[in-house]
Amino acid sequence: MTSRIELARVDLRGRTPSTAELRAALPRGGVDVDSVLHHVRPVVEAVRERGAAAALEFGEKFDGVVPATVRVPAAELARALDELDPAVRAALEESIARARRVHADQRRTDTTTEVVPGGTVTERWVPVARVGLYVPGGNAVYPSSVVMNVVPAQTAGVGSLVVASPPQANFGGLPHPTILAAAALLGVEEVWAVGGAQAVALLSYGGTDTDGAPLDPVDLITGPGNIYVTAAKRLCRGLVGIDAEAGPTEIAILADATADPAHVAADLISQAEHDVLAASVLVTDSVALADAVDAALTAQLAVVKHAERVRTALTGKQSGTVLVDDITQGLRVVDAYAAEHLEIQTADASAVAARVRSAGAVFVGPYAPVSLGDYCAGSNHVLPTAGCARHSSGLSVQTFLRGIHVVEYTEAALKDVAGHVVALADAEDLPAHGQAVTVRFEALS
């Protein structure tokens, strides 16, 4: 018999905590990346010094397998696609089509502003030249992460893509065949059988494969991973760009008495099954709903495949129910929490959702569960965690673009503003800056 699940409760009714107090009171887990940096730094340094040879040694140590080459042969990509379950292939094709439709509308166009007659500034959008897309192994297989990383990069016009995913002992040192098939379906030709911190380091520094072929370094690394991947990203940031330091997945649900407790429970469980550190948070003004959700969690947990993992996540310090006076207070709570995934299951859900200011993605109403966004909504599921949605966005076409300002001024336009340039340069005690302008209009003495 399954023991009853009762989410820990934080009661904010009748209180008006400050923002700092609110953030401190809310359930929050996360991981301490600093605690593993001393383990990861030697891995990164070894790969920097010895390239693929070091990465393969760490792969043997951590994954228990050494691939014949880091780069997966093209024949293996083709074979994985040929052998892919037809239902999974159809689902991936639908996911790709929807993601491409959404991300196509994110393309940026160059803009030119005439500041003054003869003086223009153009913002030109240029894709990152080469990108490394990390797809984790671990508790599950994530072909959907291949889609979510590759589609915006391709849409942005990135010319060179490499997917890195851990080698699997069960598959002869290759990444999981579903990962390979997804890459092939997207037209990705370069996949590396390397995972963990050593993958991030090899993507950053490059090296030489066992067959002598070059493994070119990338300019940007995206994609989620465990704490060691995150630590390696931190250590390599600057040498390469990174999308974010991803933490455990999280869902917050803002719900009132109109919500179906079975739906709320199912959605909380769906994210809890990712990881024992996953966060599932309910914010509600209805004690009756909170009680009903606890009962529904208990009932559903009895038939969930990964019951122990889910139970551990739901009963961890990162999960719980927050009781509020009303939906307005609930909105303040969810904005302070800044969830990776936020569901709105209230009356007039669209109007409530329009008031949200901090969330990685918002799922509105009873028929937009987070699972839809994970796979087939068309939105991207690589989203900011650990409260970073207060200042950061999810993966998009913009992630893979750089805006370059192109400044063009005629002689007359420069002469017209020269006095202002000189005044500001002198105010900052940088007279050579002003001289670089005036020299164009007067002879040197």
UniProtKB/Swiss-Prot annotation:
GO CC annotations, alphabetized: cytosol
Pathway(s) this gene product operates in, as recorded in its UniProt entry: Amino-acid biosynthesis; L-histidine biosynthesis; L-histidine from 5-phospho-alpha-D-ribose 1-diphosphate: step 9/9
Stored Pfam families: Histidinol_dh (PF00815)
Keyword Oxidoreductase: yes
First-tier enzyme category under EC: oxidoreductase
Positions with a binding annotation for NAD(+): 134, 198, 226
Sequence positions that bind substrate: 249, 271, 274, 341, 374, 428, 433
Role, per record: Catalyzes the sequential NAD-dependent oxidations of L-histidinol to L-histidinaldehyde and then to L-histidine.
PANTHER family assigned to the protein according to its UniProt record, in alphabetical order: HISTIDINE BIOSYNTHESIS TRIFUNCTIONAL PROTEIN (PTHR21256:SF2), HISTIDINOL DEHYDROGENASE HDH (PTHR21256)
Family: Belongs to the histidinol dehydrogenase family.
Name of the protein: Histidinol dehydrogenase
Species of provenance: Nocardia farcinica (strain IFM 10152)
Gene: hisD
